[in-house]
Amino acid sequence: MKITILSGGTGTPKLIQGFKEILPNEDISVIVNTGEDTYIGDIYLSPDIDTVLYTFSDLINDETWYGLKGDTFFCHEQLKNFGFDEVLKIGDKDRALKMHKASSLKNGVKMSEIVDIERKSLLINSKIYPMSNEKVESKVLIEENNEKILLKFHDFWIFRKGNAKVLDIFYENSNYAKAANGVLKAIHESDFVLIGPSNPITSIGPILSISEIKNALKEKLVFAVSPIVGENPVSGPAGTLMNAKGYPVSAVGVYEYYKDIVDVLVLDNSDINKKKDINCEVLYANTIMKTIDDKINLARNILDYYKSR
């Protein structure tokens, strides 16, 4: 059985940990959001790609879901001594991965090729693809002192900690972007596609904003795991951003966002009362993943449901 997973950088990697324990890793492909990618100085941040790489290689710092566990921060501290205070604390080994991306991009190497080099160097058997080799950037329109300001998502979330009145979210350049090498083939060859429990607006939305990808998904069986339980996001600013796009912060809002492509919506057991407002198949399970057993059980529930259809 082959599956393709659409992933951001927090919720979905937890579920990936479950799938990689119960499926041959070579049968898992992941298409990753790059809408938050940005340069900081001479390094290139691709936070969701890096988190997925570290998740598959069992190196992820699963307390922060960012960076490497056990990393050191000598470079970060030395930069502070020079007056260059990085808002995002980047570890030394993690910095090497980001330097590799920056150098490769400046030398004209495509992002899909860069990620594949890194995947192989980390001895990962699963395939990992950036959503596009072209720059698609998530932008957040906020209002501050009666003035509208357009921010990179990185600036909104890291610098401002998400503390702003959000008016809208855009995916800059998505109208012109193409799916990265291998993405459409992975979708076509998979038995089903899984949209993981990442932020629908800024983790999955950028992927779906590429028309080639969304059109390919319409031809496949698609599962989607809701990242919202009750009326609360499991993590991150999903609630604020869904409100800004006009969707209710609930499982119903997640369904409305994905309704053009989703066939099976995976909801937490506590959301059983939401079924009447959802016009697709619903699988109920424990979607709060605190332990490795939780992650494996959710992955297994999804696979069992697929096999029973």
From Swiss-Prot:
<comment type="similarity">
    <text>Belongs to the CofD family.</text>
</comment>
<feature type="binding site">
    <location>
        <position position="50"/>
    </location>
    <ligand>
        <name>7,8-didemethyl-8-hydroxy-5-deazariboflavin</name>
    </ligand>
</feature>
<keyword id="KW-0460">Magnesium</keyword>
<comment type="subunit">
    <text>Homodimer.</text>
</comment>
<keyword id="KW-0808">Transferase</keyword>
<protein>
    <recommendedName>
        <fullName>2-phospho-L-lactate transferase</fullName>
        <ecNumber>2.7.8.28</ecNumber>
    </recommendedName>
</protein>
<dbReference type="InterPro" id="IPR002882">
    <property type="entry name" value="CofD"/>
</dbReference>
<feature type="binding site">
    <location>
        <position position="89"/>
    </location>
    <ligand>
        <name>7,8-didemethyl-8-hydroxy-5-deazariboflavin</name>
    </ligand>
</feature>
<dbReference type="Pfam" id="PF01933">
    <property type="entry name" value="CofD"/>
</dbReference>
<dbReference type="InterPro" id="IPR038136">
    <property type="entry name" value="CofD-like_dom_sf"/>
</dbReference>
<comment type="function">
    <text>Catalyzes the transfer of the 2-phospholactate moiety from (2S)-lactyl-2-diphospho-5'-guanosine to 7,8-didemethyl-8-hydroxy-5-deazariboflavin (FO) with the formation of oxidized coenzyme F420-0 and GMP.</text>
</comment>
<dbReference type="GO" id="GO:0000287">
    <property type="term" value="F:magnesium ion binding"/>
</dbReference>
<dbReference type="GO" id="GO:0052645">
    <property type="term" value="P:F420-0 metabolic process"/>
</dbReference>
<dbReference type="InterPro" id="IPR010115">
    <property type="entry name" value="FbiA/CofD"/>
</dbReference>
<dbReference type="GO" id="GO:0043743">
    <property type="term" value="F:LPPG:FO 2-phospho-L-lactate transferase activity"/>
</dbReference>
<comment type="pathway">
    <text>Cofactor biosynthesis; coenzyme F420 biosynthesis.</text>
</comment>
